[in-house]
Amino acid sequence: MNLNRFERYPLTFGPSPITPLKRLSEHLGGKVELYAKREDCNSGLAFGGNKTRKLEYLIPEAIEQGCDTLVSIGGIQSNQTRQVAAVAAHLGMKCVLVQENWVNYSDAVYDRVGNIEMSRIMGADVRLDAAGFDIGIRPSWEKAMSDVVERGGKPFPIPAGCSEHPYGGLGFVGFAEEVRQQEKELGFKFDYIVVCSVTGSTQAGMVVGFAADGRSKNVIGVDASAKPEQTKAQILRIARHTAELVELGREITEEDVVLDTRFAYPEYGLPNEGTLEAIRLCGSLEGVLTDPVYEGKSMHGMIEMVRRGEFPDGSKVLYAHLGGAPALNAYSFLFRNG
């Protein structure tokens, strides 16, 4: 496998830390050891997150092409768009963000706090759009790029989750290589890796990266899209393409992609009672914050897998904390009593 042939523009502090979740592990019976890899604090750029790791492999292309404007898309509380806005500010580029109405959630401050507030503070041109949630290329995003061209700029397109970009999976191939190095320092290997999946490139990169040591099927994606067929197909497509890019040496098959669909309900962006319990439990036991859209659902999934005995006793499980806590303010009504 050869990731080093791709140029990387450093936007993170370096390897994100792996920390034990001792109190949560003990609360759940102590038979499974839980750890977290903290992508939520991987950068000094507006709290970082998993998209910052991905952007390290996209930005060299933007610089090489002489682009002056990063154009991206997401929901109103998109972590992706906040991270793109931060990177644009860091590089001295302009930024146009299309923020679609992906979540059926009403709150008076939903479009004024959290991620979208930070994007505005960082100087992004934020455009609200009424379109609902879907995965893939969006007309509103294409129009935003056309607008940049019409006013004499040169846009660089960054799709939702970086996932439709040819290099969207590379960052999390790097994640797997980083984990392998950290495992040497820890003196053990993780038996399972749990990660939230929506647009697919995070899990796709992990599948490829861990396929290099035979652990692709140990990457357990927890769907948060509530459109699991689309998500799984996208993970597989991106993983196959990424495997070719890095010369993995074998084909990625459907069996390599494990996606748990039990925890996404009722729909994208809306938490269920299990999500909220997981957010409160992890916060109160570990001081680690997760969000109602992504990490709360994957944390719920991991907690339930432990409770149901789905991990063998003695397993060491790595939770990939991808970020997302900045969106908590947009859901403040749900936590008005804690």
From Swiss-Prot:
InterPro entries in UniProt: ACCD_DCysDesulf, ACP_carboxylate_deaminase, ACP_carboxylate_deaminase_bac, TrpB-like_PALP, TrpB-like_PALP_sf
Activity-pH behavior: Optimum pH is 8.0.
N6-(pyridoxal phosphate)lysine modifications at: K51
Name of the top EC class for this enzyme: hydrolase
Listed GO MF terms: 1-aminocyclopropane-1-carboxylate deaminase activity; D-cysteine desulfhydrase activity; pyridoxal phosphate binding
Cofactor(s) the protein requires to work: pyridoxal 5'-phosphate
Catalysed reaction equations from the record: 1-aminocyclopropane-1-carboxylate + H2O = 2-oxobutanoate + NH4(+)
Active-site feature positions: S78 (nucleophile)
Keyword terms: Hydrolase, Pyridoxal phosphate
A Pfam family hit: PALP
Catalytic activity, EC: 3.5.99.7
GO BP terms, alphabetized: 1-aminocyclopropane-1-carboxylate metabolic process; amine catabolic process
Subunit structure: Homotrimer.
Protein family according to the UniProt entry: Belongs to the ACC deaminase/D-cysteine desulfhydrase family.
Matching PANTHER family: 1-AMINOCYCLOPROPANE-1-CARBOXYLATE DEAMINASE-RELATED
NCBIfam families tied to this protein: ACC_deam
Entry-linked HAMAP family: ACC_deaminase
Known function: Catalyzes a cyclopropane ring-opening reaction, the irreversible conversion of 1-aminocyclopropane-1-carboxylate (ACC) to ammonia and alpha-ketobutyrate. Allows growth on ACC as a nitrogen source.
Protein name per the record: 1-aminocyclopropane-1-carboxylate deaminase
